[in-house]
Each structure stands twice: as structure tokens, then as C-alpha cells.
Amino acid sequence: MSHFFAHLSRLKLINRWPLMRNVRTENVSEHSLQVAFVAHALAIIKNRKFGGNVNAERIALLAMYHDASEVITGDLPTPVKYHNPHIAREYKKIEKIAQKKLLEMLPTELQEDFRPILDDSQHTTEETFIIKQADSLCAYLKCLEELSAGNHEFNLAIARLEKTLADRHSQEMDYFMKVFVPGFSLSLDEISLDIPH
């Protein structure tokens, strides 16, 4: 018997932004799906608009599992995780142990199919970069939503994320920011105005 998917189903019980007051709580499971949506879009934009040649479906799949190890480690707040290089390195080691532990929960005959997904050392640099971009974009979108709801708790977080996005800049991210991000600051009525009848 394998408890792999029983563990993954508990990602919905791990709240993100645990040290911040949230208008709407976000869990790791829903965050992972949004990162998969955005990473997939970034990959398609890269391929269609900017001469890229990445596998958008694989990137979406990797993004779905990108925080899976948090079902074992929990969600460590970013300011803590990256407080200094030593903590970041040690936390990366803990993540590797958690990835290995998750992989070992699978039946032996399935482990080699899941290893390239769960073990982030088997992801290409380009795949990792796109997923990190999507992860940062989704955190930024969460901040926009909270700020739009009047929650000023996210003022510093959005400033930090704007710097992160600038550091992870790419043409596909610029396109996504220009075309898709503005809608996240609008109400349902405002985004529904453009829906064709």
C-alpha cells in the first residue's frame, strides 16, 4: 500500500503566508495549480513569441509538483528561508530529503516515472527558471489580490516580489505582466465586461 497521494492530498491543509494576516487564506495545493497554469503560459509564450523550444506540458507538470515536499517540511516563510545563505543551503538539503522520502512512498515500479518530476536536480536550468518565475508571479498576484482587498499587510511583500521579478526578468514574463496581470486588480464585474456574449 502506498500513502503517496494521501500525503499529497494534505497539501491543501498547509497554508501559505502563515505569518501574514490574509483576507483570503491560500493553501499550497491551490498555489501549486496556479503556478502550473502560469508556468505553462510562460512556456507557451516563450515558444510562440520569443523563439523558445521548451516542453510546456512538462513544465506545467513539474510546476504542479514544485512544492510537493512541503507536505513533509511545511511551508517555511520566504524571509526565514532566505534570511542568509547558510539557512537557504540547509533548507535545500531538507527539501532534497523530503523529495526522496516522497519518492520512496511510491510503489517501486512507479518510482522511476516520478523521479524526473519530484527530484528537482533532474530538471533543466530552463525548466527551473520558468517555474521559479511562475512561483514568484503567483506570489505577486496574491499580493495584488490582498492589496486590492485593502490589506496593507502585503505592502512590503509586494515590494520584495517586484525586486524578485526584476531579477527573474524575461521577455515572456514581460508579456505575461502586460497582458494578464492587470486583470488581477479588477473586480469580477470589471473583468466580466469584456466577455463576449
From Swiss-Prot:
Binding site for substrate: 16-17, 31, 67, 75-78, 135
Keywords: Cytoplasm, Hydrolase, Metal-binding, Nucleotide-binding
Residues reported to bind a divalent metal cation: 31, 66-67, 135
Subcellular location: Cytoplasm
Catalytic activity: a 2'-deoxyribonucleoside 5'-phosphate + H2O = a 2'-deoxyribonucleoside + phosphate
E.C. code: 3.1.3.89
Cofactor: a divalent metal cation
Record keyword Thylakoid present: no
Subunit structure comment from the entry: Homodimer.
Described function: Catalyzes the strictly specific dephosphorylation of 2'-deoxyribonucleoside 5'-monophosphates.
NCBIfam families (UniProt xref): PRK03826.1
Protein name: 5'-deoxynucleotidase plu3092
Species name: Photorhabdus laumondii subsp. laumondii (strain DSM 15139 / CIP 105565 / TT01)
